[in-house]
Amino acid sequence: MSLWLVKRETEGVSTAHLTKLGQHTVPFVDVFFDNVVVEESQRIGEAGAGWLLLMKNFEFERCLVVAQGLGLAQAAQNDAIAYAKERIAFGKPIITNPRVQGLIEQNEIMLQQTRHWLYYCLWKLDQGQSINADIAMLKSWGTRAHLQIADNAIEVYGGLGYTEEVRVGRIWRDLRGN
C-alpha cells in the first residue's frame, strides 16, 4: 500500500457531509474518488510504505484521542461537582449524599488513573520507547472510563442531566464518538 496526497480540488474528488450525534466541532465527510488520476509526484514516501507511514504517528495520535477524552471527562466531573455543591435537596446540598459522593469518587479515581497512564505513555515516547501495547490498552480502557465519568455526571444532575440545558449530555455524546 502506498500513501498518496490527493487535493480536494482534484477532478473526480467529491465529499458528502455526515451528520453526527456528537463532536460537532469536527466535521465528518464521506470522500468519493471517481476516475481520479494521480501523478507519481503525489506519492508520499516510498512505494509500498504507506502503511508504515500511517503507523509511525499512530501511537502519538492515540495519545491525543485519550487526552481529548480526558479533558472532556474532567469538564463533566467539574460540572457535576459544582452542581452537587449548589443543588439543595431536603435542606442540604446533594454533595452530602453518599450516593453522589460515591459517583464523584469513582470519577476521580478513573480520571487520575487515565491521567497518570497517559503521562507515562508520553514519557515513554519522549524516551524514544514504543508505547504500542500501553496506548492500545489505555485507549480501550480510557474511552470506556471517560464515558462512564460522563454517565456518572449525568446521574449527579438527575433528570436535568438528560436535557440539553446542561453540557454533560453533550460531553457524553462527544465521548461516545471516541
Language-model segments: residues:
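Glycine-rich, Trp-frequent "lid" loop and neighboring beta-strands that shape
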Residues: 1-6
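Flexible, small-/acidic-enriched active-site or ligand-binding loops
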Residues: 8-37
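Short intrinsically disordered coil segments
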Residues: 18-22, 44-53
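Alpha-helical interface subdomain recognition
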Residues: 30-35, 40-41, 48-49, 55-178
